[in-house]
């Protein structure tokens, strides 16, 4: 974070090296950074491992934080409640907290504008369940004082009309 085009909008160069799919963004002309995303299968449990790196290709010192966004449709998103923090806020319709978990069901499509939930999460994970499939994102658990400015450790964005949800997590800033 901050969000640069090379993270989420520019095309990536793809290559396969042994058992790793490597995607490399072109240098972003505005930010001066390039992003590499590596995907592999864990030999331990067959989960998909993702490793991101951000390279500063400019001559200026940068202060950045990793950011990951996963877009999903339908279902139910959830994560364990983290520390109390001033950034914890939400205007997401239908989201609620119960038994130490935050639950966000996919909306019915009546929301006219985007909605956003900002929070901390305990244990470094968030998940989404839809039609018999469970997707779990695991990431380093960070303290509230390590979160990028005006962001949450985890965030859920609900697109207008409930077209999709974004499950977002930030790393140490």
Predicted feature locations:
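A contiguous, surface-exposed recognition patch within enzymatic or periplasmic domains that forms
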Residues: 46, 57-173
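Extended, loop-rich substrate-binding clefts of extracytoplasmic carbohydrate-active enzymes
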Residues: 1-45, 75, 169-170
């Amino acid at each position: 974070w901050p969000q640069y085009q090379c993270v989420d909008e520019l095309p990536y160069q793809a290559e396969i090296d042994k058992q790793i799919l490597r995607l490399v963004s072109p240098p972003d002309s505005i930010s001066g950074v390039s992003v590499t995303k590596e995907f592999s299968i864990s030999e331990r449990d067959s989960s998909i491992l993702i490793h991101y790196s951000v390279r500063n290709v400019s001559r200026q010192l940068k202060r950045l934080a990793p950011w990951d966004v996963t877009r999903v449709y339908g279902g139910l998103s959830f994560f364990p409640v983290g520390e109390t923090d001033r950034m914890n806020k939400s205007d997401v319709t239908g989201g609620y907290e119960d038994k130490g978990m935050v639950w966000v069901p996919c909306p019915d499509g009546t929301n006219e504008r985007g909605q956003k939930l900002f929070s901390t999460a305990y244990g470094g994970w968030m998940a989404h369940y839809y039609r018999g499939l469970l997707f779990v994102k695991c990431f380093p658990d960070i303290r509230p004082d390590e979160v990028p400015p005006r962001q949450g450790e985890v965030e859920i964005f609900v697109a207008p009309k409930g077209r999709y949800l974004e499950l977002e997590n930030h790393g140490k800033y």
